């Protein structure tokens, strides 16, 4: 079956546009109808395993509460941490109990912010985002106040033989300091599609851990992370991807006025016939910005790791200090690692 046919069949299987993301759903579906799925001619997807990507769309998106993997056991939460577990079709995000210092964003705040960060990255034919927009029905939109003094965990488990789409927006207020941990858990023959937008106001210090663990047999994940940094903010991302049959991670960080610090430390580990790809974009829209990026990959057996790291430093971003390093370890003759740094 042709990719365009698979895409149309998937779009036709989706429920009607509805809820707070109705407008976003229409945008995503129109993009996919116009552009279709990517091909080897698209540079950003050139190395993609398209059989895996097409199977991503073969799973149904509608699930019942009985589908939820209820036997998951999580470590006991630390007294200085707050944990949110997102279970599609089981817990309405508006009814989640929030700790002191975190509140739901208002409707006007959402109107002003939702989608602006990911749109500002200016990615042409943004298929990853379009897939999420088309199929996300709930939005976890939180404002972190400067008086919040705990760590925050957001855990998203998969559902066997289902495709789930989640959307998260975090607005971190001026002067706040936050330790954030996100955990994505795969399941057999399952798929996840995540879109995360984070807006850091001035003088925010955010340490962001992202652990993405698949379950090998038919588990896949596409995750887009879009971060907007205001001046004098600090953002540190440490991520791990392991165990996915197919995974694609797209971190995009924009320093809107420069004068900010970004640290990225990513590790992806593959075995068997897995393919895990990281496509990062960091752009400086002002002077005196700093970046320290380290990408590590370990590939064994017949697996494939991909890294494409784009750094955009326009003329207005004077005195930018940007460092990017890629370190790779191949453990078998059949394994493959492709790394491509880009400075524009």
Language-model regions: role of each:
Residues 1-166, 173-175, 184, 330-344:
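N-terminal leader/transition segments
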Residues 112-344:
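Conserved beta-strand/loop scaffold segments within soluble protein domains that form the structured core
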């Amino acid at each position: 079956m042709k990719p365009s046919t698979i895409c149309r069949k998937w779009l036709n299987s989706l429920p009607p546009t509805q809820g707070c993301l109705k407008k976003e759903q229409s945008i995503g579906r129109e993009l996919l109808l116009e552009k279709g799925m990517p091909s080897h001619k698209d540079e950003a997807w050139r190395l993609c395993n398209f059989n895996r990507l097409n199977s991503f769309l073969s799973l149904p998106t509608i699930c019942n509460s009985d589908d939820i993997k209820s036997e998951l056991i999580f470590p006991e939460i630390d007294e200085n941490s707050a944990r949110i577990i997102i279970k599609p079709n089981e817990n309405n995000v508006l009814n989640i109990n929030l700790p002191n210092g975190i509140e739901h964003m208002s409707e006007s705040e959402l109107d002003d912010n939702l989608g602006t960060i990911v749109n500002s990255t200016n990615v042409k034919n943004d298929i990853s985002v379009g897939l999420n927009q088309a199929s996300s029905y709930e939005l976890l939109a939180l404002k972190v106040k400067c008086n919040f003094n705990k760590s925050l965990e957001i855990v998203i488990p998969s559902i066997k033989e289902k495709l789930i789409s989640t959307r998260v927006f975090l607005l971190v207020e001026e002067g706040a300091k936050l330790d954030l941990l996100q955990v994505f858990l795969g399941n057999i023959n399952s798929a996840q599609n995540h879109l995360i937008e984070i807006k850091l106001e001035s003088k925010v210090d955010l340490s962001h851990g992202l652990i993405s663990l698949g379950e090998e047999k038919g588990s896949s994940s596409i995750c887009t992370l879009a971060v907007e940094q205001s001046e004098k903010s600090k953002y540190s991302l440490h991520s791990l991807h392991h165990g996915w049959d197919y995974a694609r991670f797209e971190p995009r960080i924009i320093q809107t006025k420069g004068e900010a610090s970004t640290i990225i430390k990513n590790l992806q580990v593959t075995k068997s016939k897995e393919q895990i790809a990281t496509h990062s974009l960091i752009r400086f829209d002002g002077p005196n910005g700093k970046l320290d990026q380290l990408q590590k990959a370990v590939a064994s057996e017949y697996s494939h790791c991909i890294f494409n790291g784009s750094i955009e430093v326009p003329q207005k971003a004077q005195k930018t200090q940007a460092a990017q390093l890629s370190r790779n370890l191949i453990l078998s003759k059949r394994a493959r690692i492709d790394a491509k740094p880009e400075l524009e």
